[in-house]
Amino acid sequence: MGKSILDGRQALRKEIDKIAEVAGYLWQNGWAERNGGNITVNITEFVDDAIKALPAISEVRPIGETLPHLKGQYFFCKGTGKRMRDLARWPMDNGSVIRILDDCASYVIIADHAVQPTSELPSHLAVHDRQIELGSGYKATVHTHPIELVAMSHNNHFLGKDVLTKILWSMIPETKAFCPLGLGVVPYQLPGSVKLAHDTLSELEDYDVVLWEKHGVFAKGTDVMDAFDQIDVLSKSAKIYLDCKAMGYEPTGMSDEQMAEMSRAFNLPR
């Protein structure tokens, strides 16, 4: 077995283990069929001088746009065509560490293997670029296909601004507490398209989690577990709603007054 970038770097290993753990949850929840979904995490804070000196193990690859705040940043990215269930067991065989070059428009792979990152890397990196610009502290992006949330996106009634947010908040107090910005919605666009990436970036100005109509969700978080937790909580609310409907009744949900009380009690932004 060859040497890994994780050897002797416990903090970095712990971060990659966290990514692997979340990949396992995505698979176990049925949200990551075949090679569905992506994870990209900014690991620059764990990079030492020895890592900075590592040579490239790939050719220089274009990002597709210039992202001025990513100069010299390092990311762990799930590989294109790789499965979450495999990422959960063998993260360094199913993802790679990349370095953004000084032109802010290209990158190289530096470890462990020359696993080509996801084709959705440009859209993930654009979100990371914006988070650094804002100084938000967000380090992780996750794209996955939560069953109940995608199912609800097939009904146009739910796609108006904050319609789903209000419904999901009202199903269980934790949703409003732990997803206080709610759920943004991006109308259907071709997967992997520039339009989808731009619309997602715009919607993430106001939300931490965005629903892609008839496709999946895209979330940003302080780390990969934070991004997962928000998706998980929203999905629980969606399941409660759909279970109520399956039992033949419309759930009453928490009242506006009860949700306002939550906002006051926990100093929530909305």
Task: Cite the ranges covered by each PLM segment.
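Glycine-rich flexible loops
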Residues: 1-270
